[in-house]
Amino acid sequence: MDTASIYLGLKPPRTLGAWHESPPSLPPDACRCPRSHRLALKLSCAGLILLVLTLIGMSVLVRVLVQKPSREKCCVFIQENLNKTTDCSVNLECPQDWLLHRDKCFHVSQVSNTWEEGQADCGRKGATLLLIQDQEELRFLLDSIKEKYNSFWIGLRFTLPDMNWKWINGTTFNSDVLKITGVTENGSCASILGDKVTPESCASDNRWICQKELNHETPSNDS
């Protein structure tokens, strides 16, 4: 076979472009979504934004409602304390015929009776028999009374079966503050005579001294 026949039998190879043909072009409106789909997407986005705003508004409202009672309680507490402060500055007085000393009011009876009757009389006045706090308080009372020859019942008595002196509020007598001079017997109650505290029969007749804590109410004229 000659050379010319060989060349004629061979087919020419395809060009490179034939293996990489471009894909067929799409119609111009192939990527466009239908108008109804676009509208639905917009409505969904708007609904989502509205939902987020609603949740934020509700959370703010809940927080305000939770904090409101606390603020109201705080205002009430402040107002009550302001009222108390006002009362303290205005009504620091004892009833008529009572003596004021520090935070107590004192009343000296003008009649004599037993220790029990003296305590009952103080109770009717919203008070108790005298509970001596210290020597300074006792000196104030002695200087105010200025009666050296009269005995006055105080809220101290000898109790059984403890066999000990106790104040009527239940506290034990402290001999470092006061000294009791005299013989103590069963059924003894304490009275002050001058600057001395002495034991006496609770059935004896003496005058007495009442005391009550200073309060911030309008003073009464009861004596």
Swiss-Prot record:
Pfam families listed in its UniProt record: Lectin_C (PF00059)
Cross-referenced PANTHER family: KILLER CELL LECTIN-LIKE RECEPTOR SUBFAMILY B MEMBER 1
Subunit structure: Homodimer; disulfide-linked. Interacts with tyrosine kinase LCK.
Extracellular side: 67-223
Side Cytoplasmic, residues: 1-45
Protein name: Killer cell lectin-like receptor subfamily B member 1C
Leftover remarks: The anti-NK1.1 monoclonal antibody (PK136), recognizing Klrb1b and Klrb1c genes, is known to identify NK cells from B6 and SLJ mice, but not from BALB/c ones.
Organism expressing this protein natively: Mus musculus (Mouse)
Molecular-function GO terms, alphabetical: carbohydrate binding; identical protein binding; signaling receptor activity
Domain of life, per lineage: Eukaryota
GO biological process per UniProt: natural killer cell activation; positive regulation of natural killer cell mediated cytotoxicity
Described function: Plays a stimulatory role on natural killer (NK) cells cytotoxicity. Activation by cross-linking of the receptor induces Ca(2+) mobilization and interferon-gamma production.
Ranges of residues in domain C-type lectin: 101-211
Cysteine pairs bridged by disulfides in the record: 94-105, 122-210, 189-202
Tissue expression notes: Expressed in natural killer cells.
Keywords annotated in UniProt: Disulfide bond, Glycoprotein, Lectin, Membrane, Signal-anchor, Transmembrane, Transmembrane helix
Motif window: LCK-binding motif: 31-34
Predominant subcellular localization, coarse grouping: membrane
Glycosylation sites: 83, 169, 186
One GO CC term, this protein: cell surface
Membrane-spanning intervals of the chain: 46-66
Topology of the protein relative to the lipid bilayer: Single-pass type II membrane protein
